[in-house]
Amino acid sequence: MEKNRKKQIVVLSIALVCIFILVFSLFHKSATKDSANPPLTNVLTDSISQIVSACPGEIGVAVIVNNRDTVKVNNKSVYPMMSVFKVHQALALCNDFDNKGISLDTLVNINRDKLDPKTWSPMLKDYSGPVISLTVRDLLRYTLTQSDNNASNLMFKDMVNVAQTDSFIATLIPRSSFQIAYTEEEMSADHNKAYSNYTSPLGAAMLMNRLFTEGLIDDEKQSFIKNTLKECKTGVDRIAAPLLDKEGVVIAHKTGSGYVNENGVLAAHNDVAYICLPNNISYTLAVFVKDFKGNKSQASQYVAHISAVVYSLLMQTSVKS
């Protein structure tokens, strides 16, 4: 009887050891596999960080993949938005027009002598008469596709002001992630004011992502903003650069370009985009460069490099899955 009991104990002990070895082996294989294939967010963070670390300035980046996975690099800092805030302006204006029942096709007569001939303004070059007659939709198209400063200043002055814009955007993204305090005209008069129109990379990415994935304002007006951003003509050497020759890629984006100070430092060089790939992956990419010790072309190369790496990694992920 005693011998049988000892035999059972030995058999049970051997069985437990075998189970332990099996579990340990499976766990080790799983850990090895995870180590060999780290999460996409980790790979993106590491790859972007390597590019950012070599920059003679500060770069902040945010990526939102499929409205879910989020990557942040240098997001604790805030960056001058420059003309990126024209997306914020468009949303606030359209929301105000929704509430008041005003059409974007409302005609506006603009006295040419009230416009700034020295600022960036394709609109001013397109119309030579003393009075320019355009719809609000036309003005928005000028600001979103060509970053027209006169059109932006006019809408801030006569339609929806800076404070109203700032307040509305605070209902869409965290208050701490951005601030809009000045117009293009005010920043032109005092370049330091550009730093008071700021955003975190994630704040800008969140707004662009919500614009393309959620209903924020009237459907027709929101569709107009989205489609117009797909026609953006500025900054094609930034996020769009490595994507222009890629079949089936759709990009909507808005750029922002800063001033160069007396020391040759570029205050800001930005781009925020929503990108759809042919493999059903969509992502928002926000890249903000500030206090860059180099020229605009060099700053664009950093933005384009980050865009190329993100695109490549997301395409590889798609192939593997």
Swiss-Prot record:
Residues 1-30 form the signal peptide. The keyword Hydrolase applies. Disulfide bonds: none annotated. It catalyses: a beta-lactam + H2O = a substituted beta-amino acid. Keywords: Antibiotic resistance, Hydrolase, Signal. One of its GO terms (biological process) is beta-lactam antibiotic catabolic process. The active site is at S83. PANTHER family: BETA-LACTAMASE, BETA-LACTAMASE-TYPE TRANSPEPTIDASE FOLD CONTAINING PROTEIN. This is Beta-lactamase. It comes from Phocaeicola vulgatus (Bacteroides vulgatus).
